[in-house]
């Protein structure tokens, strides 16, 4: 039997990068996966890969995670089509790197909305279903930036540190409910995020999205009596 046979997962940011890798990995292990991202075309491509590979069922739901109503609709459609929600992975994220003096308040708002607030809204939206089931696992994808001082990333770091703190508190609030909450803290991952950034670390030294997917898989496949409430994953080459 596959590790996630019979499980239903919602993955945000599933169109590319880390979210895509996690969705593909979960489907390969038998999960039914609700794929959420803004791009309908990217979601269709990922859903097609899942079906071609013969993995679990895939439901592509174009979603703007900064829209509370869209998030509620995502959860409602997933629960309606698959009858339950066992796993939530919040992998949607964005970044704009600059010194605080050179940064733009509009970028602050975008990062706070996508990286922090949207993840909080997603968690709140799935909790009624998970609490009724008395089981579920939430994995919030933060960043090593939540724990390291990286020049040029003050606002990005604030959003990821906020997500880290939120996840730890939520884990305590739900400790005896059957719902587990973990936060995943990857270092530099080779994703399209770096395509437009000058001075990035060598791409071949970074983590791969599939590495992060393996870590997420570990977090959601532990037996019910165990929880990885915090997992840091770094490149072995000494870069962040």
Where are the predicted features?
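Alpha-helical segment proximal to the catalytic Tyr-Lys
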Residues: 128, 172-173
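Substrate-binding pocket helix/loop in short-chain dehydrogenase/reductase
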Residues: 99-100, 107-112
């Amino acid at each position: 039997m596959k590790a996630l046979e019979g499980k239903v997962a919602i993955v945000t940011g599933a169109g590319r990068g880390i979210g895509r890798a996690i969705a593909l990995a979960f489907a390969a292990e038998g999960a039914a996966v609700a794929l959420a991202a803004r791009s309908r075309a990217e979601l269709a491509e990922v859903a097609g890969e899942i079906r071609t590979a013969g993995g679990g069922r895939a439901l592509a739901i174009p979603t703007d995670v900064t829209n509370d109503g869209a998030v509620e609709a995502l959860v409602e459609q997933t629960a309606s089509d698959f009858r339950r929600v066992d796993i939530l992975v919040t992998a949607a994220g964005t970044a704009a790197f600059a010194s605080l003096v050179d940064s733009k308040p509009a970028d602050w708002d975008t990062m706070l909305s996508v990286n922090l607030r949207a993840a909080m809204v997603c968690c709140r939206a799935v909790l009624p279903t998970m609490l009724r089931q008395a089981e579920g696992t939430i994995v919030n994808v933060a960043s090593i930036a939540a724990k390291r001082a990286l020049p040029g990333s003050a606002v990005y770091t604030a959003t990821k540190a906020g997500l880290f703190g939120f996840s730890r508190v939520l884990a305590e609030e739900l400790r005896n409910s059957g719902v587990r909450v973990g936060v995943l803290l990857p270092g530099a991952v080779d994703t399209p995020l770096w395509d437009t950034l000058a001075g990035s670390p060598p791409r071949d030294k970074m983590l791969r999205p599939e590495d992060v997917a393996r870590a997420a898989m570990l977090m959601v496949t532990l037996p019910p009596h165990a929880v990885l409430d915090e997992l840091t994953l770094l490149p072995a080459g000494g870069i962040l």
